[in-house]
Amino acid sequence: MTSKSLPTRTTLSSGTFYQIYPPSFADSNKDGIGDFRGIISRLDYLSDLGITGIWLNACFDSPFKDGGYDVRDYTKVASRYGTHEDLVELFHQAHARGIAIILDLVPGHTSEQHLWFQQSAASEYTDFDDRYIWTSHAFEGGAGLAFIGGEHPRNGAYIINFFKSQPALNYGFAELTQPWHQPVDAPGPRANQDAMVEIMKYWLSQGADGFRVDMADSLVKNDGTSKRATIGIWQSMLSQVRAEFPNAIFVSEWGTPTQAFEAGFDADFYLDWRGNGYNLLARNTDTPLERRNDASFFNSDSATGAQEFLDMYLPQWERTHEAGLFSFISGNHDCPRLAPRLNEQERALFFLFQLTMPGLPFIYYGDEIGLPYAEIPTKEGGYARTGSRTPMCWDSQLPNGGFSLGNAPLYLPMTDTSQNVAQQRERADSLSHHVQKLIQLRSQLPALDGFADLEFDLSLLKKHPKVMVYRRTHHGGDSVLIALNAGNKPIRVEFQQPQAHELFRCGDVAYPDLSDHSVVELGPTSGVILSV
């Protein structure tokens, strides 16, 4: 193991992050559930892949009615993943390999079993009365907000964010329209802000490098589309944390970069479920297993072109590219996986795109080997999302695909072992090696830095709607050209760059004149990176 420099806020942009769903990555104690020690045992794999950061999904103490996103104690780890010391050791071992770890922070709600809520729900007055949002009496609804009434001694109904088990923390209301609405600077909302600041400081002091913040844009209710009050709260909280931990990394689940970066976040996810066009690329479907109904751009059989996505993406990038990292994801625990809807060549082309675009790319565990979505029963509130959370497959020759060497029932069934790390390591042309090479290029070429300039050639789209051609340039210096054909027919692309030099190819790529790379012929589902 060689020591590598740890990414910080100022060096994030050349790296690649990897999302781990803890119960499904690696099981060290043979109980069928992934854990911190299991992740430690696989850090060398991530280091070899070129990963510079890990986003660790919710791992705090929880009754797991929503996969851990119903937190019972923010300063205690979930015992099924190990001990506090195990998590600290994970920080240490990751840092020794130059890998940062950001934890999942869920600031908008807690579990109904959290001590704060238990005290807030009591019939007698406590200091926690206003830490959650309660209506004036048990028979009063939420005035447009989801609510639960009649389950606790307190005479009121409480507002929930998602499930009944997730009471919303009170950060106030931007518009006060009900007697029980409180302003953002009321004592209850202020106490919640202070508590979140202390929670972040605590985990940073334990060795965490930052946080991915769940539903970061949804703290203040009635905040409209501008999110002015929520932005102000984050500016206050993050400035307090950074006064003590200036290198702390903050990534938001916001999906509106103009707002997220103003709020103080370093990176913001480009989310499928926002109305921003990202779903058009690889998840333009309601049937995660059926290719026939998939209208994604990277499905070579679909008619979907690049123009609609670019019309929505480029204005956002132009407004925000100097302020933060608008980040493409391969997937996550809440959305369908790329496989099996997209075949391996299409997934390879998707990664060529993702890893050459601006921002800070996030790879969901297993996507680099083609781990498929599985149609399985719901687990811990996952419902349709459960199929994207199945165990990582390490070696098909080992019990349980190497995820767990014990006999205990697995957290989720391993439905397919055909795509596994061991098999892909043996194939020089595997998806895993393809991703590894792209990550290496991204880390080595300043022109592929997350903050490097971006310029799309839109002239080809009318004739070839499933083609993308774009240039990345590092501050007026080195440039690379990327051309990709997501369609099922070959095309010819001409550049005004006779001295272009090929750096990487995906699929069938040919040059009519071998001494001149200014004209390239791209086969179906193919792409190329050229140095110019």
Where do the protein language model's features map onto the residues?
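C-terminal beta-strand-rich structural cap/linker in extracellular carbohydrate-active enzymes
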Residues: L514-V532
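Short, solvent-exposed loop/turn segments at secondary-structure junctions
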Residues: P23-F25, F60-S62, P107-G108, D209, ...
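Acidic/aromatic-lined carbohydrate-recognition and catalytic surfaces
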Residues: T2-A191, S205, A216-A263
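Loop/helix patches that line or flank the sugar-binding groove of alpha-linked glycan CAZymes
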Residues: L12-S13, R242-E244, F261-G264, N279, ...
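Active-site-proximal helices and loops of the catalytic beta/alpha 8
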Residues: H92, G108-H109, H114-D127, W134, ...
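Short beta-strand segments
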Residues: Q19-Y21, W55-A58, F211-M215, V251-E253, ...
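An active-site-proximal structural segment forming one wall of the substrate-binding cleft
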Residues: P189-F211
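Beta-strand-rich binding/interaction modules
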Residues: K489-V509
